[in-house]
Amino acid sequence: MSRFPAVAGRAPRRQEEGERPVELQEERPSAVRIADREEKGCTSQEGGTTPTFPIQKQRKKLIQAVRDNSFLIVTGNTGSGKTTQLPKYLYEAGFSQHGMIGVTQPRKVAAISVAQRVAEEMKCTLGSKVGYQVRFDDCSSKETAIKYMTDGCLLKHILGDPNLNKFSVIILDEAHERTLTTDILFGLLKKLFQDKSPNRKEHLKVVVMSATMELAKLSAFFGNCPIFDIPGRLYPVREKFCNLIGPRDRENTAYIQAIVKVTMDIHLNEMAGDILVFLTGQFEIEKSCELLFQMAESVDYDYDVQDTTLDGLLILPCYGSMTTDQQRRIFLPPPPGIRKCVISTNISATSLTIDGIRYVVDGGFVKQLNHNPRLGLDILEVVPISKSEALQRSGRAGRTASGKCFRIYSKDFWNQCMPDHVIPEIKRTSLTSVVLTLKCLAIHDVIRFPYLDPPNERLILEALKQLYQCDAIDRSGHVTRLGLSMVEFPLPPHLTCAVIRAASLDCEDLLLPIAAMLSVENVFIRPVDPEYQKEAEQKHRELAAKAGGFNDFATLAVIFEQCKSSGAPASWCQKHWIHWRCLFSAFRVEAQLRELIRKLKQQSDFPRETFEGPKHEVLRRCLCAGYFKNVARRSVGRTFCTMDGRGSPVHIHPSSALHEQETKLEWIIFHEVLVTTKVYARIVCPIRYEWVRDLLPKLHELNAHDLSSVARREMRDDARRKWTNKENVKQLKDGISKEVLKKMQRRNDDKSISDARARFLERKQQRIQDHSDTLKETG
């Protein structure tokens, strides 16, 4: 488990021999030193005072601009104060008298941390005047006037309040990230004003905030609304291309050693100032923390470091699945003489602002969800960042003083491999969940919905087909009663379908823990240290064996139940190398799902079924009801082929309990695929063909165009055009035939025949005369 945060320096607490690092361990040098500093009266940005921001000079103009316009775009550099200060200004100007001020964030970490910050500045308890709502966690009340939330939570709110009557202002923050949900919110808000609904509040205002984006395009989308620019206060940032990655290394992400070396060089050779390092995910971050700590431990601060005021390096990881307390540590100032180094995902590029950063190390890559048309699935891939994202990252080094950005890639990599802007998520991921939401909002024409960037029609049709396969829509593309129930669940439609099937069999207790575990991040800790890695793998194998050793879904259920019943869940997780924070989240998810199922089963028309058979078979049958699209059959050796019509080859992931048991299997279902050197199926269980025999035809029985009312209308129009053209041709042919007939009739009467004979004889007589004249001339 991670030992970080930790300080490597002159006098850190060394790990005892044989001691294993403990997750969430509080007795660490960094935490103790920071706490001591707070007790001595040193304050930080988190301490309840409002720092100065460039936005403060624009306060009056900005408030007036919001009053004067239904839509307003606010732009400014990251750190200008848009996220924390504008909602406060609007609250103090009285906007909350007509409803809440809602502020969306793409990530739950940002929604929570910003709400905490604003509550401290306004000197109120979090959940009172200032609150937040993220998936599975609603910290708000009737008193709440400023509500930070994920964009997904606002989309769910619109299902019950389509006209947003509870809000006076909607602020869509971080619009430049172009998440799928934010793009759908763009369209819904535009449609709300276009339709001129009589129930819409007159006072509703929409503010779109972005650090970097195609602003003219966004303004045109919202009816050429004004753009309010907040002048920035960024200091100059010098950029250096380290040339460690070139265009040929586009697929190569094995750059951890290089990044650690660059980071260590900064610590040794640059003057005071904190460091921010960008990597793609938790595994890379924890590995980098370990390597950097090992290097920093060997530094002699009397001779090796150029800045003699430095005594150590405080190493702090930052990624989405960390607890709130762990995330808060990155905002605290380091102890005197200690340089802070935050190693983070892309979340620190825009969503979080960390004071004191003067050096940025840009790894050049990000994890991105992309739709793989060959597999028909969304794949989480590591891809090069865009140029706009790279500029966002470098800007973090120039907030409080001049800084430096070290890009590990080359200038050629920048020019050849990095797109100018982020590719909108709506153009590269599955649209199944949002299409269902639009259908439930009575928006049936999902193809002609007002998208800022229209997605590929193929993605829309594929989403419709998947919803039909889950019985969420009927053959006409209209949402079913089941679809209306499914949209309430914070799960993907196929997993919701499996849960509802289990509820109809009165065995939801078997599936709810699994659904909850699949809703959180990977629960298994896989340490970098080889010794701990072996111990963790052994513990994970033991857990799989308790589930029968042949079903990864069942293993998740065993982990859930054993941890919950242990009496000391955090200690149980520590012993078994399981992320306690993920299990804690799963417990909350399971409770919410159980309440939704309870309400669903109270409906008089809820279907009831019976099944006589062992529990493990019932569980797998219910999984088949939702995952039959992810069915694969063994073909050759250890390779399986999907049965969705593509026949894509997949392999069982090495982390699965079924790995190296492939020859014993015939049919499997899987939760997701990962693409590395091969296409791997992850979280797998064996099934029987007869369980999916009646379900598989649904993958092929209907053309996706049949589910789209637009496609049907266009096909009808096309058919009408073809019929009209056919009739015109027929009429033309008929007209030609009548004309020909008249000519034939005219030619065949007696007068026509005698006239034709006379003309023939006349021409013959003329030829004879001409021939006679020629002979006379030659003679």
Swiss-Prot record:
InterPro entries the UniProt entry points to: DEAD-box_helicase_OB_fold (IPR011709), DEAD/DEAH_box_helicase_dom (IPR011545), DNA/RNA_helicase_DEAH_CS (IPR002464), HA2_WH (IPR048333), Helicase-assoc_dom (IPR007502), Helicase_ATP-bd (IPR014001), Helicase_C-like (IPR001650), P-loop_NTPase (IPR027417)
One matching Pfam family: OB_NTP_bind
Ranges annotated as biased composition (Polar residues): 42-53
Protein residues bound to ATP: 76-83
One Gene Ontology cellular component: spliceosomal complex
Helicase ATP-binding domain boundaries: 63-231
Motif DEAH box mapped to chain: 173-176
Protein name: Probable ATP-dependent RNA helicase DHX40
Family, per entry: Belongs to the DEAD box helicase family. DEAH subfamily.
Comp. bias (Basic and acidic residues): 13-41
Signal peptide range: none
A GO BP entry: mRNA splicing, via spliceosome
Region (Disordered): 1-53
GO molecular function, one term: ATP binding
UniProt keyword annotations, A-Z: ATP-binding, Helicase, Hydrolase, Nucleotide-binding
Gene from which this protein is expressed: Dhx40
Domain Helicase C-terminal, first and last residues per copy: 263-442
Organism: Rattus norvegicus (Rat)
Record has Magnesium as a keyword: no
Entry function: Probable ATP-dependent RNA helicase.
EC number(s) stated in the UniProt entry for this protein: 3.6.4.13
Keyword Hydrolase: yes
Catalysed reactions listed for this entry: ATP + H2O = ADP + phosphate + H(+)
